[in-house]
Amino acid sequence: MDLDGFISIILGGARFSPSNAELELADRSHAYLSEYASGKVIYGINTGFGPMAQVAIPEADRRSLQYNLVRSHASGAGADLPDEAIRAMLLVRAVTFLKGGSAVTRGVLDGLSNYLNTGVCPTVPELGGVGASGDLVQQAHLGLGLIGEGTGTYQGKKDSMSAILKAAGVSPIELGLRDGLAILNGTACMTGIGLLNVHHAYRLLDHSIAMGSLLTEVLCSWDDHLSETLNGAKRHAGQREVAERMRANIAGSKLTRDRSGHLYAGKEEVDANGVFTELVQEHYSIRCIPQILGPVLDTIRNAEKVLLDELHSVDDNTLTVADHGVFHGGNFHGDQVALEMDKLRLAVVKMCM
């Protein structure tokens, strides 16, 4: 799934339909973990969480452990995230789970698909997560909605999840082996919102390039600051592409001017004070548009790559690899996404200056 495919589901109304091969991989991983976990100590299945990982959980309590994890961490505050952010979270979780590393039950995957395709959105507050241990609080609220508790929105109206699911004809999920932990433990919130940010940043850049082209034309600018030769002297793809797009935008213009036909042709005029009556070169803010928007384009593209890499990663702890074992680690950590969002924020500010 690329950015366009992601956005088509979140904003464009396209359906989410996992392939049979993806579902079979997830089923195989869950079946493997169910058998592999017998007689072994595995975090989040028969242990507590975080600093309570040293506490053994009796087999009779393991299912309720998953529910209690979701309910206890659904403690966020602040305004509700918009529906597009919730849908992005649902989709990121679904894509990640289809990699098999979280070993979730089929019911979780069916639930995520049903919520996406019917437009059911659990209520998720914007404050509470820190990213360093995954988006625990936001994803706990997502999980709360998936099990049919809490509140949500459907067709523009907020209500209890039980009423929403009845109206939408959707069933809540039931949590199995480590489903609660899998829903909480990862970067779905920051990754989903990050991909939306990248999409909107591209749109803003398109407008910025169009406005820069318009300014170049209405000010009757010299056109050599956009030349392929000048911008090709810098080895930055973003600058070169911005200049190319601006050249295409003003192609055939009767307002922009060719320097060789005037200042380089001995036609320059000087007033009584010895000052050229024509600008020798364009104002700084005009002739540096490719050098300003080019780095912005490069930054957005790099953010897109990192966010798509995260989308197609397994961001969970533990990691289940069928026929190879279970691995404990820190793939839930969100710095990869967070640093890209810091850079993207600077780029967006630059566009608006």
Model-derived regions, located:
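Conserved, well-structured ligand/cofactor-binding cores
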Residues: 1-353
